[in-house]
């Protein structure tokens, strides 16, 4: 049996180890996407995709998510702010189509400092997702998205 002084010392040591935990234990906000959307859930009718948002500090709200549709239509660069809809699932938001049928488009979706680039095919379906990141200890750390990354992705998409 531990004596009270040993127990207090052990508890204090454990507390100090926890309090001094390295920053790499923390994780940044993260985004993942669901597409195609369940066609049998009538509340999601018209949704192109679902955004799953996660943070270490709790469940994100709709005000935490932002985005834009970035496109090239008839050779002209376009940017359209996106609005997201809450769903019945916490931290999951629906995105309905808000951009033109013509041209090549990608979606820039952000949750705080994490940004994803979602590419769309010629039919408007999700064809890829990229969260630009650096890596630390084998894990991705989201980094800011440069305008040139959006432009080069659109240039490649419009060539197809």
What are these regions (language model features)?
Residues 9-19:
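Bacterial N-terminal signal peptides
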Residues 23-160:
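N-terminal soluble domains immediately following signal/targeting peptides that reside
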């Amino acid at each position: 049996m531990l004596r009270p002084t040993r127990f207090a010392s052990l508890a204090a040591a454990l507390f100090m180890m926890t309090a001094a935990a390295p920053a790499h234990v923390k994780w940044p906000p993260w985004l993942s996407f669901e597409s195609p959307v369940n066609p049998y859930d009538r509340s999601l009718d018209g949704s192109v995709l679902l955004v799953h948002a996660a943070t270490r500090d709790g469940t994100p709200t709709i005000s935490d998510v932002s985005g834009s549709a970035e496109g090239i239509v008839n050779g002209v660069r376009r940017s359209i702010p996106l609005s997201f809809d809450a769903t019945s699932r916490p931290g999951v938001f629906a995105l309905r189509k808000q951009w033109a049928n013509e041209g090549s488009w990608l979606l820039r979706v952000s949750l705080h400092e994490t940004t994803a680039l979602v590419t769309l095919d010629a039919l408007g379906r999700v064809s890829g997702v990229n969260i630009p990141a650096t890596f630390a200890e084998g894990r991705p750390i989201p980094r800011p998205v440069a305008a040139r990354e959006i432009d080069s992705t659109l240039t490649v998409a419009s060539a197809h």
